[in-house]
């Protein structure tokens, strides 16, 4: 809801809500190695139903974790033949059930590439994405099993702890396609500079991966470079976690003058 108000207001774009299980403060089961597998699959399926009913030619997806890119990117791949993905993320998102990490948000790009070990690939309606159709921007150090996945599938990547991919590299990639999808994981931003990201919460552990290193100014430059040189047909903004705003909300909920009739 907060992201909806942060983004520019655009009366030409209809808003559709994907039905997902609301936070209930409870733990879900790990099924077939996937945490809350039934709920994850139900969200993807509902998103696909909306897309197939509305039939948009462009899709903006906001909210949720990285798994929210699966349905729209798969759908748009069924519309556009020449389609590349710019994956702006501190992490590669190619983990599988075999790697022992149960959270599906880390599986999504592997799933879009047709990796069977995600327990989600069977939900795809269209062909898989190929290794040469993916460009990582902002990628930080990766686990050995992720490196193995990328190497075996010939996915080109550069660890960007010291230097991000250049504008020329982005232009070279986007020039090979008629259309581009952008996946933006907010955790690509430096958690020391931007606090509405997973890694700004010291209580969270995840899979041991680290924070992104990008500044807001650099991210803006990257997005401007992409849109100036290609036709963007899909844009995901994932993993925006407004911890400070949540803390304020909890505090204000206990103030009588704000809650009394």
Question: Which role fits each region the language model picked out?
Answer:
Residues 142-148:
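Short, glycine/polar-rich helix-capping loops at beta-to-alpha or helix-loop-helix junctions
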Residues 91-92, 140-142, 185-189:
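Short glycine-enriched loops at secondary-structure junctions
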Residues 58-127, 133:
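Active-site histidine-anchored catalytic micro-motif
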Residues 117-118, 137-142, 214-218:
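A general structural motif
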Residues 87-90, 113, 136-141, 159-161, ...:
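Short, structured patches in soluble enzyme cores that scaffold and shape functional sites
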Residues 1-60, 68-78, 149-151, 155-261:
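Catalytic cores of soluble, metal-dependent hydrolases
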Residues 22, 92, 116, 141, ...:
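Residue-level detector of flexible, active-site-proximal loop/helix-junction positions
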